[in-house]
């Protein structure tokens, strides 16, 4: 069994773990005062309960009684006993052990008093100690008496007041008899011993902190020389005073301080409660809110703010407000008109249909309709390659007028209209006018127009009698009049004053139909509209080129290795040169295939979307590596040398309104370069021809194109 330190507060001050048992002498030295009566009753009861198992144990002094943390009391082992202050004969019976326990409790009650002083005890406690300490005299007196006579002793024992206490059971019975409920004596006295043990440890820890604080203050003094004070002097400095104050504080906390008045309960004669320490009792009351706050008086009265709780104040405020109207009686104000944002206005304008320009009069209805807005191909001797159709010439051989069917065309986009308006505003009255085709007019629409015109020509041979054709709408169909440089190569319908159509325009609103020659019908049936002859955009050329490249790639399907290399971009699409492993070759803009630097050329185009760039505005940078690429094929060198002219490099000057936002350079392979160059040449020639068309024929645009009366092919 471990021993506790002999010096009070040494364990707590030295930082060692708290002991789990203390001797009665250590408790007395810590408090510097004797035990109270309640603690004496508890030590007697718990001591008898702990010593029942060893009746021959000898208690020589208060140091032999040990108090444990659970409230039990035991005796110290004989071999660990210290030198006794009073010599006691060896105990050989339970009666002598009870007697030694009585002497120890008496010394604990009389500890610290002078010999001349005597402590006043309660009659019950004084009688118990007297019976325990004088049991040997009672024993000897009983032996001298007559053995056969035991009447008075039996009478006293029958009355419940024994003449001597010789056993532990008798002492425990007397300790329990003083309580109102003797059955709870064990729990009560165990709680008292536990409280005594815990309070002693707290007092020792408090005294250790006081001693450390004093030592700290002495070290902080700089004006006085540092003098080493003996440890005993520091320990004894104010020890008694601090211990007395501690005991008074514990007594006040246990008896006098109450946060809330306890309701009346059953009468309990116990003066104090020892189940918990004062600190534990205070914390338990705070947690359980067993307290009642005093009301604060202001001018002799409680303020109105604290008369009611918050919930009642809120309800009073709600009741004080005017009553709410019923839902059926409420009328909400109309919402103010919401102002539309600029974004919403723009979206509404986009969703609305385009407004057509009104027809100015019947004089405009009598005008002829020009040719379709298509692009002329390079003029050749074959009439099949001609793509310009003159729709303004009347049929001279027609004897009667016939109705002209109308074809619905798609309206141009907003971007196209802006480009056309911008180009018309920047032109001078005498300068050439750059025309742009309606990109929404596709080949399917042209084929449909061709079929309707052909059907109209067939029905014109037997026109109904007396029928008058409907008046045509003035629109954007242009009358094409070629210049002097194109008259020998390109077909045209020249406005002649002697022409019957032109002579009858000013006099009558009807336009007689002209007869169609068999050659014209034959040429119209064999009319073709090649891709390169259209004023395509870059996006349309890219789509066409991708379809052609996809068809060209099908011939490499038999050679899977070559097909895979071309598809994955491991070799050049033109010269079939293999690229290095960690290289990043450029890709062609049109066919999206990898191309080497010797087979590519830089193409110049405006900084716009591909769908808004006409193909005739493209240009090429002069290749600097034509002379260095000696291994290049002759056909590729010819392509590069054919792009040396100034017409490919001065596109910014030729089309300033399109290149106003700058230009970009794109890589194009040699195969796509030859394809695009042919398309650009054809488009530029057609644009040059369309520039000679008078401006008055392009004043307005119509979504309807009437059927032609004469098709002139040469």
Curated annotation (Swiss-Prot):
> In which residue ranges is the amino acid composition biased (Polar residues)?
486-496
GO-annotated molecular function: actin binding; microtubule binding
InterPro entries, per this entry?
Answer: KIND_dom, Spire, Znf_FYVE_PHD
Check the record and name the Pfam families matching this protein: KIND
Answer yes or no on keyword Transmembrane helix: no
Could you name the Gene Ontology cellular component terms for this entry?
Answer: cell cortex; cleavage furrow; cytoplasmic vesicle membrane; cytoskeleton; cytosol
Q: What is its main location?
A: cytoplasm
Which residue stretches belong to region Disordered? Answer: 136-162, 453-516
GO terms of biological process kind:
actin cytoskeleton organization; actin filament network formation; actin nucleation; cleavage furrow formation; establishment of meiotic spindle localization; formin-nucleated actin cable assembly; Golgi vesicle transport; intracellular transport
Q: Which SUPFAM superfamilies match?
A: FYVE/PHD zinc finger
Tell me where in this chain the KIND domain is found. Answer: 22-203
Question: What function does the entry list?
Answer: Acts as an actin nucleation factor, remains associated with the slow-growing pointed end of the new filament. Involved in intracellular vesicle transport along actin fibers, providing a novel link between actin cytoskeleton dynamics and intracellular transport. Required for asymmetric spindle positioning and asymmetric cell division during meiosis. Required for normal formation of the cleavage furrow and for polar body extrusion during female germ cell meiosis.
Q: What is this protein called?
A: Protein spire homolog 2
Taxonomic lineage from the root: Eukaryota, Metazoa, Chordata, Craniata, Vertebrata
């Amino acid at each position: 069994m471990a021993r506790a330190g002999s010096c009070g507060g040494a364990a707590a001050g030295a930082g060692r773990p708290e002991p789990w048992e203390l001797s009665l002498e250590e408790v007395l030295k810590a408090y510097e005062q004797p035990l109270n009566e309640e603690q004496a009753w508890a030590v007697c009861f718990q001591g008898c309960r702990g010593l029942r198992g060893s009746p021959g144990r000898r208690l020589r002094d208060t140091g032999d009684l040990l108090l444990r943390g659970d409230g039990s009391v035991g005796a110290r082992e004989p071999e660990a006993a210290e030198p006794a202050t009073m010599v006691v004969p060896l105990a050989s019976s339970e009666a002598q052990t009870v007697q030694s326990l009585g002497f120890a409790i008496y010394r604990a009650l009389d500890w610290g008093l002078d010999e001349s002083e005597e402590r006043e005890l309660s009659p019950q406690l004084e009688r118990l100690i007297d019976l325990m300490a004088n049991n040997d005299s009672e024993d000897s007196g009983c032996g001298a008496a007559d053995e056969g006579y035991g009447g008075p002793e039996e009478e006293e024992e029958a009355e419940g007041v024994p003449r001597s206490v010789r056993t532990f059971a008798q002492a425990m019975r007397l300790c329990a008899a003083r309580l109102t409920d003797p059955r709870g004596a064990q729990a009560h006295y165990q709680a008292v011993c536990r409280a005594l043990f815990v309070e002693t440890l707290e007092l020792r820890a408090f005294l250790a902190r006081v001693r450390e604080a004093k030592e700290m203050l002495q070290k902080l003094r700089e004006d006085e020389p540092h003098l080493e004070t003996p440890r005993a002097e520091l320990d004894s400095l104010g020890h008694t005073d601090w211990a007395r104050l501690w005991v008074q504080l514990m007594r006040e906390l246990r008896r006098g301080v109450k946060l809330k008045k306890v309701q009346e309960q059953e009468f309990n004669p116990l003066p104090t409660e020892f189940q918990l320490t004062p600190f534990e009792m205070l914390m338990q009351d705070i947690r359980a809110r067993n307290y009642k706050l005093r009301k604060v008086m202001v001018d002799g009265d409680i303020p109105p703010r604290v008369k009611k709780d918050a919930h009642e104040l809120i309800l009073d405020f709600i009741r004080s407000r005017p009553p709410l109207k019923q839902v059926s009686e409420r009328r909400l104000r109309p919402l103010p008109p919401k102002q539309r944002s600029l974004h919403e206005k723009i979206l509404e304008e986009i969703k609305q249909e385009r407004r057509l320009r009104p027809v100015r009069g019947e004089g405009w209805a009598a005008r002829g309709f020009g040719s379709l807005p298509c692009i002329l191909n390079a003029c050749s001797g074959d009439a099949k390659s001609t793509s310009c159709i003159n729709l303004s010439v009347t049929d001279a051989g027609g004897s009667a007028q016939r109705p002209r069917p109308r074809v619905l065309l798609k309206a141009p986009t907003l971007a196209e209209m802006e480009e056309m308006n911008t180009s018309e505003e920047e032109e001078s009255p005498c300068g050439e006018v750059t025309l742009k085709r309606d990109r929404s007019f596709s080949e399917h629409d042209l084929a449909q127009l061709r079929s309707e015109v052909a059907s109209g020509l067939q029905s014109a041979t037997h026109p109904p009698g007396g029928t008058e054709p409907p008046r045509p709408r003035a629109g954007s169909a242009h009358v094409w009049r070629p210049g002097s440089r194109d008259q020998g190569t390109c077909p045209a319908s020249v406005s002649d004053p002697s022409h019957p159509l032109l002579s009858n325009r000013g006099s009558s609103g009807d336009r007689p139909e002209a007869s169609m020659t068999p050659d014209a019908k034959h040429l119209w049936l064999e009319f073709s509209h090649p891709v390169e002859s259209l004023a395509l955009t870059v996006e349309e050329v890219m789509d066409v080129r991708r379809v052609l490249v996809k068809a060209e790639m099908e011939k490499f399907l038999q050679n899977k290795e070559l097909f895979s290399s071309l598809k994955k971009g491991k070799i050049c699409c033109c010269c079939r040169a293999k690229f290095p492993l960690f290289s990043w070759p450029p890709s062609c803009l049109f066919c999206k295939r990898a191309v080497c630097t010797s087979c590519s050329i830089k193409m110049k185009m405006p900084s716009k979307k591909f769908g808004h760039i006409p193909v005739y505005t493209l240009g090429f940078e002069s290749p600097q590596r034509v002379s260095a690429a000696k291994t290049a094929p002759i056909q590729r060198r010819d392509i590069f040398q054919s792009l040396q002219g100034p017409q490919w490099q001065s596109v910014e000057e030729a089309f300033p309104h399109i290149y106003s936002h700058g230009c970009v350079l794109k890589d194009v392979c040699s195969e796509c370069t030859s394809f695009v160059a042919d398309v650009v040449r054809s488009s530029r020639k057609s644009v040059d021809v369309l520039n000679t068309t008078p401006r008055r024929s392009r004043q307005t645009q119509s979504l309807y194109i009437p059927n032609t009366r004469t098709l002139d092919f040469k």
